[in-house]
């Protein structure tokens, strides 16, 4: 059976007069779209438009909840209790879900954004709060979680489906976490380098950390950040080379079926 992997991108991150990302172009390349829900980015007009575009391209629609931090784009840590995190995720899923249904689709997955994602990757209680929010609102949806993280453990404990995500356009620490964006070399915008890393993770099950050490990794889904100026080039190159290597690029549901069949 050929390998299968999902290709996802964060999108719907414009709001009001502010435009961000190349959503329309990316939707021709990705299989899953993580759509901002109004807290770190996005608004009701952008949410509807992005869901509509994704549904028309048969791209899986997912919620991308973040901290309530428009000014910081959800990339600044906030000290919230697990209960607060659970409820802010429920709130944002609830905001996006009707738009999906109005466009004839359903939320297929949930992926936390930015600082919320990174904090939950290493904090089990926050990770569990997110998993519980998914179970209470969209129990059939898949949690998209950093590979080998606390989110994967929490999802399994709570009893929801989970897929392990890797990043072609980000550098890794030795412990499998992402290098902070404030550090040199944290963001990768060279299509060749990003593609080589994606192939290494999918085909060889490993990634080279920023200190040169190889670490094992599980790659169910590859993320390309929509706000990366070279996102379209990266996604196009990655998809082309994956398919050349006989890897099927499909949405998360099919990746899970293949991984556990």
Curated annotation (Swiss-Prot):
Fetch the SUPFAM superfamilies from UniProt.
Glycoside hydrolase/deacetylase
Which UniProt keywords are listed? ATP-binding, Hydrolase, Nucleotide-binding
From what superkingdom does this record's organism come? Bacteria
What catalytic activity does the UniProt entry give for this protein? 5-oxo-L-proline + ATP + 2 H2O = L-glutamate + ADP + phosphate + H(+)
Recorded hits in Gene3D superfamilies, A to Z, give:
Glycoside hydrolase/deacetylase
Matching PANTHER family, A to Z?
5-OXOPROLINASE SUBUNIT A, UNCHARACTERIZED PROTEIN YBGL-RELATED
Q: Member of which family? A: Belongs to the LamB/PxpA family.
Quaternary structure (record)? Forms a complex composed of PxpA, PxpB and PxpC.
Can you name this protein? Answer: 5-oxoprolinase subunit A
Q: Which organism is it from?
A: Coprothermobacter proteolyticus (strain ATCC 35245 / DSM 5265 / OCM 4 / BT)
Taxon lineage: Bacteria, Pseudomonadati, Coprothermobacterota, Coprothermobacteria, Coprothermobacterales
């Amino acid at each position: 059976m050929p390998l299968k992997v999902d290709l996802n991108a964060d999108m719907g991150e414009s709001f009001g007069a502010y435009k961000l990302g190349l959503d329309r172009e990316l939707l021709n390349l990705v299989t899953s779209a993580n759509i901002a829900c109004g807290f770190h980015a996005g608004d009701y007009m952008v949410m509807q438009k992005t869901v509509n575009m994704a549904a028309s391209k048969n791209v899986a629609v997912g919620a991308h909840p973040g901290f309530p931090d428009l000014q910081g784009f959800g990339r600044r840590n906030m000290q919230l209790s697990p209960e607060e995190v659970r409820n802010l995720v429920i709130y944002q899923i609830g905001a996006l879900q009707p738009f999906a249904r109005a466009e004839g689709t359903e939320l297929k997955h949930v992926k936390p954004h930015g600082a919320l994602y990174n904090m939950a990757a290493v904090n089990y209680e926050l990770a569990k709060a997110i998993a519980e929010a998914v179970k209470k609102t969209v129990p059939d949806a898949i949690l998209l979680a950093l590979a080998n993280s606390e989110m994967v453990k929490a999802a399994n404990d709570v009893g929801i489906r989970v897929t392990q995500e890797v990043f072609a356009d980000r550098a890794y620490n030795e412990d499998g976490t992402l290098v902070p964006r404030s550090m040199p070399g944290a963001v990768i915008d060279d299509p060749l380098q990003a593609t080589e890393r994606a192939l290494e993770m999918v085909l060889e099950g490993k990634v080279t950390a920023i200190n040169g050490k190889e670490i094992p990794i599980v790659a169910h889904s590859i993320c390309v950040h929509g706000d990366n100026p070279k996102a379209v080039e990266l996604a196009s190159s990655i998809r082309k080379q994956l398919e050349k290597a006989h890897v099927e690029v499909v949405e998360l549901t099919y990746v899970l079926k293949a991984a556990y069949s």
